[in-house]
Amino acid sequence: MRIGVIGAMQIEIDNLKKSLENSTTEEISSVQFVKGNIGEVEVVAAVSGVGKVFAAICTEAMILKYQVDMVVNIGVAGTLCKELGVMDVALASQVVQHDMNTSALGDDIGLLSGINQIYIPVSYTHLRAH
């Protein structure tokens, strides 16, 4: 299995990069990708930059170049949920594009034109505790 890990900022990915064995580095589309192993798992790590456009560019380059089986986005995030605190881990069950609104065209708020979905389910197929 090959896992891609993306963080928006260097501090979010530094410890992971230090943990990689037999690592190599390559730059694609101004993004530095570090490939290595943690045990028997191949890992490709990168700092995308802040924002969904940078994250999308990084994710696409990672998928096309390294054929990762899954991509995990790690790092700092905000929340409106009172139950979550600092250093808590949150896993989404679905994602939504919160800043897109084509309701003036008759669409529901949040609708992603083309795939005609508001909520996109997340797969937990590869997730397991070690």
Positions of the model-derived regions?
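Conserved small/polar residues in nucleotide/adenosyl-binding loops
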Residues: 125-130
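Metabolite-binding pocket within alpha/beta catalytic cores that recognizes anionic/polar moieties
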Residues: 2-124
